[in-house]
């Protein structure tokens, strides 16, 4: 029996093995059994074990390194998550704020588009063109997230009349804070004959009294004596522009005075930076010992030599050659070329700016009109104070926190036009810098000036005047600045407003033709209020962060001001109305 194995092709049987001729069946000697154990194929066992140990150690080290790397990777992920979480939270707040801003901007654009459509429709119809121009000129906007306000003659008075009209003439349901309440009580106590002209019974705040108080605050920055072709506000803006053009870099010159008004925040930022970089200590007051005690103007038209020159703003204007040196600073005659090569020591850049931007063909030499110069420096100081008060203000806080609610007394307010924050946005999230002030000058100051060319700063911002008048003065007198500070809480602040109460009483008496007060008495009372306002400006400018100080000390609560939104409206209107129940 034969078996055929295809792998080896071997035929076997009962007899001898046969090897058929095949490529796999070749003749070769027997293979040595211990061939692969020869020394040539084997090495020292100790060397092999050592190499194995080295390889094992390397593998263990690599494993440990991989384990450490894995642990570090986990810790890095945890650390990154820990650091990213607060950033993500801030980004969420910023995204919310940006969404609110976009909503407000969209609403403002819709409102502007609607207004443009309405104006264009009237223009196309060709009817009442002059009325439309007058109406649009009397439209202002104080904050970005509120609609336009249209007024007749005086924004503060017109809005006040609307407040009382919507309260159905129940005067006791409208309050303006403890400051105005104190003024009215002082008037009733000191001038009972004048008090009969107002309705103060039953705890009411008289509309007549509030209107008179606001107009008195607005008047304290005006010069009642002398004929002048330029207002203090115009002179202040010209000085700011001339200083910016003289000392600034990358200057953009305005094409007209209206564009200069819109650029005032830029000029103020530049002036503030230059004053802060100077080595000398800043002084925002005059030498009161050399000035008249009870009048703003001097009987002879000039103050004592050196009375105004210590003021930091005036010193900066003179040192930068925006204004020429004051009287007596230089001898008469020309200065030698070695000292003044350009012979421009007596050039007046403000007069040149007035000719270029206003073109009234009237010279403007402030150094020759010292009362106007003093009023101009006061206006620049007030503008710097306004710049500090409105820096980084947050108008997008939750509306329910604002005491000033436009929809409470202005009918027909569209909710989409009064956009507030959807959440309570923290004040440190929104950094507005000077954008709210820039908007205020573009949409409030410029339209106001376009309507009334000779308008003064105090007419635009009576609330800032009230803040200056509310600064407590030292017990040494109104003009005493060297009295030491005492830790005494003064609850008799009514006596410091005696000048304002006197001016209000005179204005109320002048409303009756039967009792016409003397002009001299009115001017004297007006000057006393102006001097007190000047003193308050100096005191508030000594504070680096006046808004924070006023909020921390609760001074603003006396005017019904609780938020930055309230503060901006209070500065522009002079009051914050609050409607209360009369039950």
From Swiss-Prot:
GO biological process annotations for this chain's record? symbiont entry into host cell; viral genome packaging; viral penetration into host nucleus
**According to the lineage, what is the superkingdom?**
Viruses
Compartments in which it is found: Virion; Host nucleus
Main location as per UniProt: virion
**Annotated region Interaction with major capsid protein/MCP: where?**
1-49
Pfam families to which the protein is assigned, alphabetical: Herpes_UL25
* InterPro entries according to UniProt: Herpes_UL25
Keywords tagged on the record? Capsid protein, Host nucleus, Host-virus interaction, Viral genome packaging, Viral penetration into host nucleus, Viral release from host cell, Virion, Virus entry into host cell
Question: Is Secreted one of the keywords?
Answer: no
Keyword Metal-binding among record annotations:
no
Coiled-coil ranges (or none): none
Q: Which GO terms describe its cellular component?
A: host cell; host cell nucleus; viral capsid
**HAMAP family (alphabetical):** HSV_CVC2
Task: Name the protein family.
Answer: Belongs to the herpesviridae CVC2 protein family.
Q: What does this protein do?
A: Capsid vertex-specific component that plays a role during viral DNA encapsidation, assuring correct genome cleavage and presumably stabilizing capsids that contain full-length viral genomes. Participates in the interaction between the capsid and the tegument through interaction with the large tegument protein/LTP.
Under the subunit heading, UniProt states: Heterodimerizes with CVC1. Interacts with major capsid protein/MCP and triplex capsid protein 1/TRX1 at the pentamer vertices. Interacts with the large tegument protein/LTP.
Q: What is this protein called?
A: Capsid vertex component 2
* Species of origin: Gallid herpesvirus 2 (strain Chicken/Md5/ATCC VR-987)
């Amino acid at each position: 029996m034969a078996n055929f194995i295809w792998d080896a092709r071997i035929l076997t049987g009962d007899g001898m093995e046969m090897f058929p001729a095949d490529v796999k069946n070749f003749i070769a000697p027997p293979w040595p059994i211990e061939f692969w154990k020869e020394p040539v194929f084997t090495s020292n066992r100790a060397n092999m074990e050592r190499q194995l140990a080295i390889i094992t150690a390397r593998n263990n080290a690599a494993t440990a390194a991989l384990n450490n790397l894995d642990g570090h990777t986990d810790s890095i992920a945890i650390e990154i998550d820990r650091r990213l979480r607060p950033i993500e939270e801030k980004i969420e707040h910023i995204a919310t704020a940006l969404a609110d801003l976009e909503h407000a901007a969209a609403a403002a654009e819709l409102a502007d588009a609607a207004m443009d459509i309405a104006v264009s429709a009237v223009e196309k119809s060709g009817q009442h063109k002059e009325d439309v121009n007058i109406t649009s000129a009397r439209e202002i906007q104080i904050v970005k997230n509120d609609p336009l306000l249209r007024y007749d003659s005086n924004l503060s008075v017109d809005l006040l009349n609307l407040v009382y009209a919507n309260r159905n003439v129940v005067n006791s349901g409208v309050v303006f804070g403890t400051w105005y309440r104190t003024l009215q009580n002082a008037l009733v106590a000191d001038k009972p004959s004048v008090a009969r002209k107002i309705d103060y019974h039953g705890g009411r705040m008289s509309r007549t009294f509030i209107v008179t108080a606001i107009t008195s605050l607005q008047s304290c920055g005006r010069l009642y004596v002398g004929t002048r072709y330029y207002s203090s506000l115009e002179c202040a803006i010209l000085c700011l522009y001339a200083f910016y053009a003289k000392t600034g870099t990358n200057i953009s010159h305005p094409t007209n005075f209206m564009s200069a008004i819109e650029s005032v925040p830029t000029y103020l930022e530049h002036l503030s930076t230059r004053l802060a970089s100077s080595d000398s200590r800043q002084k925002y007051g005059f030498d009161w010992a050399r000035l008249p005690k009870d009048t703003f103007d001097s009987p002879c038209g000039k103050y004592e030599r050196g009375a105004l020159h210590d003021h930091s703003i005036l010193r900066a204007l003179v040192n930068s050659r925006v204004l020429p040196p004051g009287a007596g600073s230089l001898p008469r005659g020309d200065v030698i070329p070695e000292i003044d090569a350009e012979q421009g020591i007596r050039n007046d850049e403000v007069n040149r700016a007035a000719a270029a931007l206003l073109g009234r063909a009237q010279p403007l030499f402030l150094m020759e009109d010292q009362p106007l110069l003093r009023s101009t420096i006061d206006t620049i100081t007030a503008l710097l104070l306004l710049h500090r008060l409105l820096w980084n203000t947050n108008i997008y806080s939750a509306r329910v926190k604002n005491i000033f609610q436009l929809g409470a007394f202005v009918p027909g307010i569209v909710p989409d036009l009064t956009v507030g924050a959807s959440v309570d946005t923290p004040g440190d999230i929104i950094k507005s810098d000077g954008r709210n002030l820039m908007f205020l000058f573009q949409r409030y100051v410029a339209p106001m000036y376009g309507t009334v060319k000779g308008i003064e700063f105090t007419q635009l911002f009576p609330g800032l005047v009230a803040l200056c008048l509310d600064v407590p003065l030292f017990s040494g007198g109104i003009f005493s600045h060297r009295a030491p500070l005492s830790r005494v809480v003064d609850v008799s602040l009514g006596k410091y407003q005696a000048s304002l109460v006197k001016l209000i009483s005179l204005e109320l008496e002048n409303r009756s033709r039967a009792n016409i007060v003397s002009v001299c008495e009115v001017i004297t009372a007006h000057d006393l209020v102006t001097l007190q306002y000047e003193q308050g400006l100096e005191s508030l400018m000594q504070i680096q962060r006046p808004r924070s100080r006023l909020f921390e000390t609760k001074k603003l609560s006396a005017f019904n001001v609780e938020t930055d939104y309230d503060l901006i409206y209070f500065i522009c209107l002079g009051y914050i109305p609050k409607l209360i129940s009369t039950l």
